[in-house]
């Protein structure tokens, strides 16, 4: 209307405003190593369900190497896609699932190859136990991912008392997360889903 005031209030040219969706974008990084594989299956089911809550979802699986699995969900039935993720390279899978966990290497690869996927509209969800088997946790990469994101959420099957034991670097990673939640079963994932829905609304 303000634009049309110069024409004595007579509508002359319609003025439209493009409405931009405020639904968040999701990036999910899922550890599928042996120690968290059962939980990873549940989480990948959750990822599939979350796609309707976000303007875009990009999904990645890692052990030490990291691969994008977004297209697997688009091109295959869910159970078949899950099989391709966890089957391992000898069985025609997309990832060496028998390697030792290396979150630091995976985060570095993600930042180098896919870092542009994260911006201030992106919520990053990480599933992992934070165990690097003595390798460099690459906190600089974790910090940079978190800095770029709208929110960083870490889901872990590890009980809190074990976070500082052995090769677990989760306490260090937690410093760069907005929320860390213990998820060990379907009920825990449902609670995480409820919290994620609140963020998306």
Functional labels for PLM-detected ranges:
Residues 80-122, 159-165:
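Von Willebrand factor
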Residues 50-72, 148-167:
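A short, conserved beta-to-alpha structural element at the edge of catalytic cores
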Residues 143-201:
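Von Willebrand factor type A / integrin I
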Residues 23-24, 30-65, 74:
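…and closely analogous acidic/polar surface helices at protein-protein or active-site interfaces
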Residues 35-37, 66, 131-134, 161:
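Short acidic, S/G/P-rich loop/turn micro-motifs used as interaction or catalytic elements
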Residues 104-151, 181-183, 195-201:
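Exposed acidic/Ser/Thr-rich ligand/metal-binding surfaces
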């Amino acid at each position: 209307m303000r634009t049309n005031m110069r024409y004595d209030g007579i509508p002359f040219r319609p003025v439209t405003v493009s409405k931009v969706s405020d639904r968040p974008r999701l990036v999910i990084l899922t550890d599928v190593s042996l120690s968290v594989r059962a939980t990873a299956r549940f989480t990948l089911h959750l990822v599939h369900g979350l796609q309707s809550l976000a303007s875009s979802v990009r999904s990645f699986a890692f052990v030490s190497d990291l691969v994008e699995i977004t297209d697997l969900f688009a091109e295959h039935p869910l159970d078949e896609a899950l099989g391709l993720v966890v089957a391992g390279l000898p069985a025609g899978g997309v990832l060496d699932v028998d390697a030792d966990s290396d979150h630091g290497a995976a985060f570095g690869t993600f930042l180098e190859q896919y870092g542009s996927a994260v911006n201030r509209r992106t919520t990053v969800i990480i599933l992992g136990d934070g165990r690097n088997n003595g390798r460099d946790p690459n906190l600089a990469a974790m910090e940079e991912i978190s800095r770029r994101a709208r929110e960083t959420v870490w889901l872990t099957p590890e009980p809190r008392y074990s976070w500082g034991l052995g090769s677990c670097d989760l306490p260090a990673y937690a410093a760069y997360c907005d929320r860390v939640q213990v998820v060990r079963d379907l009920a825990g994932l449902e609670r995480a889903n409820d919290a994620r829905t609140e963020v998306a609304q």
